[in-house]
Amino acid sequence: LDIFTVLESSRIDGYVDELYPGVMKMYEMVRLAALESRPDVTDLPAREALVEFMIRVSLGQVDEMIVPSEHKDAARKLRRLIRQVTSTDAIVEDAAEAAIRAYSILIDVKNDELEDDDYEELEDDEEDSDDSGDDEDVVDPEEVIQQFMGMAAPDGDGEGEQEDGSDEQDFEG
C-alpha cells in the first residue's frame, strides 16, 4: 500500500464511522480480520515498520502498537496525521497533504534491519488526536518532491538532464 492510500482510506473510514454508525459492527469485524493478517512489525526494517504502524492505526488498532524505539517521535507524528484526516470535515486534499507530510517524515528513516530489542510499545497518547499543529510538522511540498527526485536515480546516470543541470524536456505533439 502507498501512504496516500492508507491516509485516504482512513479519511473515508472516519466518514463512514461518523455518518453511518449502523454498519460499524460489521466494519469492525472486517478491520479485526485485516489486523490479524498483518505481518509482525518486529520482522520488518525500520521504515517498513513505520508504514505497517500507519496501516495498523488506520485499521483501528490502539493497543500493543510496536514501533522502532529510535523512531517513536516519527510514529507519534504519523499517528497524528492519520487521526487528523479521520474528521468528517477532511477532504481528499487533506489526505494528499498528509501524505506529503508522512513522506517527509519517512524519508528521514533509514530502512535498516533491526533487532527485536530495537522495538518498543508506543502508548496511545490522546493528545496526538488534537490539533496541536506543531510548526515542526509543516513541510514545504516542493522540498519533499526534490528529496524524492534525488532518491529516484541512485545510480546517478543523469539521463534526461541537460549539461547545465536543468531537466528540460522537448515535447512535441
PLM region spans:
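Short, functionally important secondary-structure microenvironments
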Residues: 1-173
